[in-house]
């Protein structure tokens, strides 16, 4: 656990040898629930624990889903992202039925929205039509300032708090804490 310069925010950074964890998890009888067991009691110290997962449904993501209470699903405003979303929602159902009955979907967040393109509008319309209130009201625009922030080791809201992307993520955070 590493403290940050931001009050009440600590991080557990990923490491290059995290790939070896996949092999280790496969060897363990409790491999699918290892992270859940490791995080038991974390709520006593932290109000929120966020697990940033790779965009695949491998063992690390399954472990995170088994440990989570809720899952926030980011979806890029692009055609193929819709296909991946269907697959992910099915995986969430599978994890819920086999490993974690308390798992729920906090919402679907539309990201990389380009207001100049018809595609972004079409994807947003389809998501809202099919998923309704599950889709966050706020969307995150495609933004150079968002893309720059990691290179400075900063969250977007610290890199440029007035940027459209930082403001969008602030709205998402407020909406997330309001949702059950």
Spans of features found by a protein language model:
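Short, conserved glycine- and acidic-residue-centered signature motifs
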Residues: 28, 81-84, 165
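Charged catalytic carboxylate motif
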Residues: 34, 87, 168
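C-terminal boundary of histidine-terminating zinc-finger modules
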Residues: 150-171
């Amino acid at each position: 656990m590493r403290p940050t310069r931001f009050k009440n925010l600590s991080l557990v950074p990923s490491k290059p040898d995290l790939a070896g964890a996949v092999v280790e998890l496969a060897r363990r009888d409790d491999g699918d629930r290892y992270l859940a067991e490791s995080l038991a009691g974390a709520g006593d110290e932290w109000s929120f624990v966020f697990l940033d997962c790779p965009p695949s449904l491998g063992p690390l993501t399954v472990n995170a889903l088994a440990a989570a209470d809720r899952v926030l699903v980011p979806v890029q405003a692009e055609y193929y992202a819709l296909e991946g979303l269907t697959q992910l929602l099915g995986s969430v159902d599978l994890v819920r039925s086999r490993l974690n009955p308390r798992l729920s979907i906090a919402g679907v967040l539309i990201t990389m929205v380009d207001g100049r393109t018809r595609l972004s509008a079409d994807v947003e319309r389809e998501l809202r039509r099919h998923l309704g209130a599950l889709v966050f009201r706020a969307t995150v625009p495609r933004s150079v300032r968002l893309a720059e922030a990691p290179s400075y080791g900063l969250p977007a809201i610290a890199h440029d708090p007035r940027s459209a992307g930082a403001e969008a993520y602030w709205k998402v955070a407020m909406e997330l804490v309001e949702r059950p």
